[in-house]
Design a protein with these regions (language model features):
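Short, well-ordered beta-strand segments in beta-rich or mixed alpha/beta enzyme
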Residues: 6, 69-75, 108-138
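Generic marker of residues within folded, mature protein domains
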Residues: 62, 99, 112-113, 144-146
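Short, Lys/Arg-rich amphipathic alpha-helical interaction segments
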Residues: 119-125, 129-178, 186
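Secondary-structure boundary/capping positions in well-ordered alpha/beta enzyme cores
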Residues: 106-107, 150
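Short S/T/G/P-rich N-terminal loop/turn motif that feeds into the first structured element of a domain
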Residues: 1-105, 158-186
Length: 186
């Protein structure tokens, strides 16, 4: 993500703070869920990388009226290889749920383990591209704490639901050979 795209620090902290409060309310009402139907699926991307879904998060809400898919990627700053650092991050990442579930427009997230290049991805469904962009512009500040600055990227694909992307792999128009374009699911 270009630095010009991120929110200034104070508005980002305000947005993240409001999200945390909203998430707390949602957790108290038990409207946040961790279904297992996609856990273990291997997703392949147009850049040749693959990653396994290790967690899924959904919320109770009406179907998105303006669906879009958001893909976010980053590489952890101090963790390399396939060892305990990645396992620890995947375990601890559950705590990061409070940083996205309460944002307006959130529908669902697939959490993808690191690929062969050490890159993690989140594959989200969001209600409204503007809401997805607002979220990711605030998220930059949380990611920069643990990520290599130049590795933080995102792509919003409007007009499509996450499950449609999973079912109709490669249907993104125009076809793109990019890090975010899903080309296979197993």
């Amino acid at each position: 993500m270009r630095e010009s795209q991120r929110l200034p620090f104070r508005p980002a902290m305000a947005a993240l703070g409001l999200c945390i409060v909203t998430t707390g309310r949602m957790l108290a009402r038990r409207t946040v869920h961790l279904p297992r139907r996609n856990v273990g699926r291997r997703l392949s991307f147009a850049d040749g990388s693959t990653a396994v879904v290790y967690r899924e998060t959904t919320v109770d809400r009406d179907k998105a009226s303006d669906p879009c898919v958001l893909v976010v990627s980053f590489r952890l700053r101090w963790v390399r290889g396939w060892g305990w650092g990645h396992r620890l991050f995947r375990w601890e990442s559950m705590l990061n749920t409070v940083l996205f579930v309460g944002f307006p427009g959130f529908v669902s997230k697939l959490w993808l383990a690191h690929d062969r290049n050490g890159v993690y991805r989140g594959l989200y469904e969001w209600d409204g591209p503007a809401s997805a962009e607002a979220y990711v512009r605030a998220l930059w500040w949380a990611l920069i704490v643990v990520s290599e600055k130049d590795s933080i990227r995102h792509q919003v694909v409007p007009g499509i639901r996450r499950d449609a992307v999973l079912a109709g792999v490669g249907d993104v128009e125009p076809p793109a050979r990019e890090w975010w374009n899903l080309v296979g699911v197993s």
